[in-house]
């Protein structure tokens, strides 16, 4: 546990970085987003099983919002909560306001591009741009790093412990 405490102290310190270091960080995050996109299901509708894809004009959104994230996420962890939510209520009916769900701050219009009903995963660069514009890039990177720590490592990758820092070469 002391390692975790040190990492929080490190985050509280003010750090001055150059543009080159920021570019390197953005490149690393972009690579992590691409790698994670390759491991995730091809669409959110497939992760939810029998649920039909939601169109943009639909009255509800298939977004799942956890307590730790202020924006919608589509993960197997979130899918379990989503599926559990639907088991306790009546079947979905198009055009009714009864199945309205919050999509998180800033997503009030439920304009989630990744839930547009397409069968292909969004372009990782488009997702990176969305995260940059919404200000959630760091939160998404931390969430994905935590998820990567919970899942088994793919062959050929190296695991980073919580106590050490690594540098990009």
UniProtKB/Swiss-Prot annotation:
Keywords: Developmental protein. Residues 122-145 are annotated as: Involved in GSK-3 binding. Residues 79-91 have a biased composition (Basic residues). GO terms for cellular component: cytoplasm. Binds GSK-3 and prevents GSK-3-dependent phosphorylation. Regulates the stability of beta-catenin in embryos. Maternal GBP is required for dorsal-ventral axis formation. Belongs to the GSK-3-binding protein family. This is GSK-3-binding protein. It comes from Xenopus laevis (African clawed frog).
């Amino acid at each position: 546990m002391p390692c975790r405490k040190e990492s929080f102290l490190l985050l509280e310190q003010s750090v001055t970085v150059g543009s080159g270091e920021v570019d390197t960080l953005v490149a690393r995050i972009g690579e992590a987003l691409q790698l994670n996109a390759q491991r995730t299901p091809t669409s959110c509708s497939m992760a939810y099983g029998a649920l039909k894809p939601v169109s943009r004009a639909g009255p509800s959104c298939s977004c799942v919002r956890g307590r730790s994230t202020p924006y919608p996420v589509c993960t197997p962890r979130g899918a379990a909560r989503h599926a559990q939510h639907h088991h306790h209520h009546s079947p979905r009916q198009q055009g009714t306001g009864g199945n309205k769900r919050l999509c998180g701050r800033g997503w009030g219009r439920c304009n989630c591009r990744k839930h547009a009903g397409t069968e292909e995963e969004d372009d990782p660069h488009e997702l990176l741009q969305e995260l940059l514009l919404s200000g959630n890039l760091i939160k998404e990177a931390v969430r994905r790093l935590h998820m990567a720590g919970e899942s088994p490592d793919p062959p050929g990758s190296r695991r980073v412990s919580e106590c050490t820092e690594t540098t990009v070469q």
